[in-house]
C-alpha cells in the first residue's frame, strides 16, 4: 500500500508539472501586453538594453484591444524548458523572426534563434535573432529570453488540434502534402521561464512601430553617420590615412568618417585598446586634424582583452572560463568591468575626439567564441552570454557618448531584442551580393 501511495503522488506530480496553462496577460502600455511563464531569469535582452518605453508616443498610436486569436495561448514547463503555443488562423501570414536575407514570409519554417555569423541560410543563426514574429492579422509576439529559442512557425501538428489536417493516402492521392496544415506557432525556450510580450496594431507596420516605441523609439543618427565612409587597410599609419583623405578631396568625393581597422592598436586579436605609437605617434593631433576637416574617426574593436592591455590585471577576476584567441572574455554585465572599459576607452578614444566603434566578432562562429558550457562570474552560462554580449557592448558605449552629450553611430556584428534605441547598425562578413539585394 505504501508503494501505491508513493506511485500515486509521483504520478500526480507529473500531471501537475506537465499541465498546460493559459497565459495571463497584463497591459503594460497602450497596445502592449505582457505575460510570464514559469520563473524567468533576471538577465534578458530587454533588461540588458534597459528599455525605456515611450508611453506618450505609444498612446498616440491608439488603444487597440488584445488580439482575439491569442486568447487561447498556452504555456507549459516541461523537461526544464518553457513550451509556448499561439493559435494561427487558416490564411494567416507571419513575418520577422530575426534578420533574414533570403525570406520574408516565415509561416511553415523552423528557426533556432541564436546570435551567430550569418552563414547563408535563414535558419535562425544570424546577427540579430530577435524572437519577434509579426502577423498580418495586426499583432506581434516577442519572447524575451537570452536563450537559443526554437520556433516552429505553423509547422507542428498536435493530435488534439481543433483544426487537424486531413489524413491522406499517398498511394492514391496525388495532392498528398508532406507538410500538413498546422494551426499554431510552437516555441521552445530552453529555460524554466520566460517573459512574453504582445504588440497590437491595425496592420503589421503599426505593430513594428509599437515594438520600436516600447523599446524607447528609434535613433536619430548624427548627420555624419549617414554620409560616405571609407575603411583603411589594417596597418595604415596616420600619414597614410591623411593621404587617403587628400585623395578623396582631390577628386571632390564626400567623406564623412574614416574607419581604422585593428592595426590602430599596438596589439590586436586579442586587443590592448591602446594606440600604436609607431603608426599613430600623436593620436589626439591626428583625430583633431580630421575633425577640422569635418571627418570623424571610427575605431575597430572586439571586446577580448590581451594580457598586454592596461585593464588586463584588474579585469581578469571578472572574466569567463574560456578565452577567445587567447584573450580573456570579460563579463560585460558586471559594473566593475563596465567601469574599467569606460575609464580606458574615455582616456584613449572619446576624450581625444573618437566618434564611434565598429564592434567585431561578438556574434560567432562557434569555433571562435566560447562554448555553451562556459561560465561567467555573474552566473550566466555561455549560451546566455552569447545572446546578449553584443547588445551589452552597444548599451555600454552608447552611455559613454550620452554622458558627453555627443551622438555616435557605430557598427556591430551582434544584436538582439531591445536594440531599436541604440545607435548601431548591423554589419557582417557575408559577401553574397545577390542575397543582400
Segments the model singles out, each with a brief description of its role:
Residues 20-437:
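Catalytic-domain carbohydrate-binding cleft regions of carbohydrate-active enzymes
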Amino acid at each position: 500500500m505504501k508503494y501505491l501511495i508513493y506511485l500515486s503522488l509521483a504520478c500526480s506530480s507529473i500531471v501537475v508539472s506537465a499541465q498546460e496553462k493559459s497565459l495571463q496577460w497584463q497591459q503594460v502600455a497602450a497596445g502592449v501586453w505582457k505575460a510570464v511563464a514559469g520563473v524567468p531569469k533576471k538577465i534578458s535582452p530587454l533588461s540588458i538594453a534597459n528599455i525605456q518605453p515611450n508611453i506618450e508616443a505609444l498612446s498616440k498610436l491608439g488603444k487597440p484591444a488584445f488580439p482575439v486569436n491569442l486568447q487561447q495561448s498556452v504555456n507549459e514547463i516541461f523537461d526544464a524548458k518553457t513550451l509556448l503555443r499561439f493559435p494561427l488562423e487558416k490564411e494567416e501570414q507571419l513575418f520577422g523572426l530575426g534578420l533574414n536575407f533570403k525570406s520574408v514570409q516565415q509561416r511553415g519554417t523552423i528557426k533556432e534563434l541564436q546570435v551567430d555569423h550569418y552563414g547563408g541560410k535563414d535558419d535562425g543563426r544570424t546577427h540579430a535573432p530577435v524572437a519577434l514574429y509579426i502577423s498580418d492579422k495586426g499583432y506581434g509576439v516577442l519572447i524575451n529570453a537570452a536563450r537559443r529559442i526554437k520556433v516552429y512557425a505553423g509547422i507542428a501538428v498536435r493530435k488534439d488540434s481543433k483544426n487537424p489536417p486531413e489524413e491522406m493516402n499517398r498511394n492514391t492521392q496525388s495532392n498528398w502534402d508532406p507538410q500538413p496544415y498546422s494551426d499554431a506557432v510552437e516555441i521552445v525556450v530552453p529555460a524554466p521561464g520566460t517573459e512574453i510580450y504582445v504588440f497590437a496594431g491595425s496592420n503589421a507596420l503599426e505593430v513594428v512601430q509599437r515594438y520600436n516605441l516600447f523599446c524607447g523609439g528609434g535613433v536619430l543618427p548624427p548627420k555624419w553617420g549617414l554620409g560616405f565612409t571609407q575603411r583603411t587597410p589594417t596597418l595604415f599609419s596616420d600619414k597614410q590615412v591623411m593621404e587617403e583623405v587628400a585623395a578623396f578631396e582631390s577628386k571632390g568625393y564626400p567623406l564623412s568618417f574614416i574607419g581604422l581597422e585593428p592595426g590602430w592598436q599596438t596589439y590586436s586579436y586579442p586587443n590592448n585598446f591602446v594606440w600604436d605609437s609607431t603608426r599613430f605617434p600623436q593620436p589626439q593631433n591626428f583625430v583633431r586634424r580630421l575633425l577640422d576637416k569635418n571627418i570623424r574617426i571610427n575605431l575597430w574593436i572586439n571586446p577580448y582583452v590581451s594580457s598586454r592591455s592596461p585593464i588586463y590585471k584588474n579585469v581578469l577576476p571578472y572574466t569567463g572560463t574560456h578565452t577567445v584567441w587567447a584573450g580573456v572574455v570579460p563579463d560585460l554585465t558586471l559594473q566593475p568591468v563596465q567601469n574599467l572599459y569606460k575609464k580606458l576607452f574615455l582616456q584613449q578614444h572619446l576624450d581625444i575626439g573618437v566618434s564611434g566603434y565598429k564592434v567585431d566578432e561578438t556574434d560567432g562562429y562557434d569555433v571562435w567564441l566560447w562554448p555553451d558550457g562556459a561560465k561567467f562570474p555573474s552566473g550566466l552560462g555561455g549560451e546566455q552570454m552569447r545572446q546578449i554580449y553584443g547588445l551589452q557592448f552597444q548599451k555600454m558605449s552608447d552611455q559613454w557618448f550620452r554622458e558627453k552629450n555627443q551622438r555616435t553611430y557605430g557598427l556591430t556584428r551582434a544584436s538582439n531584442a531591445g536594440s531599436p534605441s541604440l545607435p548601431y547598425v548591423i554589419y557582417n562578413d557575408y559577401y553574397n551580393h545577390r542575397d543582400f539585394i
